[in-house]
Amino acid sequence: MTRLLGGRIEVICGCMFSGKTEELIRRLNHVRLARQRLIAFTPRRDTRYRLGSLVSHNGLSVEARVIDSIRDIPAYLDSDVDVVAVDELHLLDDPPDAAREVCQQLADRGLRVIVAGLDQDFRAQPFPAMAQLMAVAEQVDKLYAICVRCGAYATRSQRLIDGKPAPADAPTIVVGGQELYEARCRACYEPAQ
């Protein structure tokens, strides 16, 4: 067990299908190779795959605790934990500042905190919790997908309803995969009306 001096916060962000969970799992595999103790968390809202696992679109997985709030995390930690991972942060039902506060407290205890999530909603507006966390993180990695329309780098998540862009007044959070979302570049993204 090797705890990082001072701890740190790492954020992995990007649009749908950009490989955020895959990158998180890759980092957690390195943590295991270093014989560090980790604990991973996933939101109860994420019902796309197996509850209790971080699962990437390509099928990689890691066991995870299911939580409703970022504030649930400290109750699961003991003194042996070195690394805390949270996938799909934007799906947690918390005030925007809760993620920043909890992650900073964990990093201040000397833990490495790795968080993955969407940086923007389907309207191309920032998810407030992710934006706040990115501002205080030691490392922010923005990943991109490939635009399904033109093949350029995609940074937007286009939500579709019957093949058309979702209206601006649609709910911000709708859990889904390729049946509801497409990765699109700035030029091909159609703003919600």
From Swiss-Prot:
Kindly list the biological process annotations in GO that this record carries.
Answer: DNA biosynthetic process; thymidine metabolic process
Q: Which residues bind Zn(2+)?
A: C147, C150, C185, C188
Q: Which Pfam families match?
A: TK
Sites binding ATP sit at G14, C15, M16, F17, S18, G19, K20, T21, D87, E88, L89, H90
Per UniProt, subcellular location reads as: Cytoplasm
Q: Which GO terms describe its molecular function?
A: ATP binding; thymidine kinase activity; zinc ion binding
**Swiss-Prot/TrEMBL catalytic activity:** thymidine + ATP = dTMP + ADP + H(+)
Give the active-site positions.
Answer: E88 (proton acceptor)
- What superkingdom heads the lineage? Bacteria
Q: Which keywords has UniProt assigned to this entry?
A: ATP-binding, Cytoplasm, DNA synthesis, Kinase, Metal-binding, Nucleotide-binding, Transferase, Zinc
A single GO cellular-component term from the record reads: cytosol
Q: What is its EC number?
A: 2.7.1.21
InterPro entries reported for this sequence: P-loop_NTPase, Thymidine_kinase, Thymidine_kinase_CS
- UniProt family annotation: Belongs to the thymidine kinase family.
What assembly does the database describe for this protein?
Homotetramer.
PANTHER family on file: THYMIDINE KINASE (PTHR11441), THYMIDINE KINASE, CYTOSOLIC (PTHR11441:SF0)
Check the record and name the HAMAP family matching this protein: Thymidine_kinase
- Protein name as annotated: Thymidine kinase
Q: Per the UniProt entry, what species is this protein from, by scientific name?
A: Roseiflexus sp. (strain RS-1)
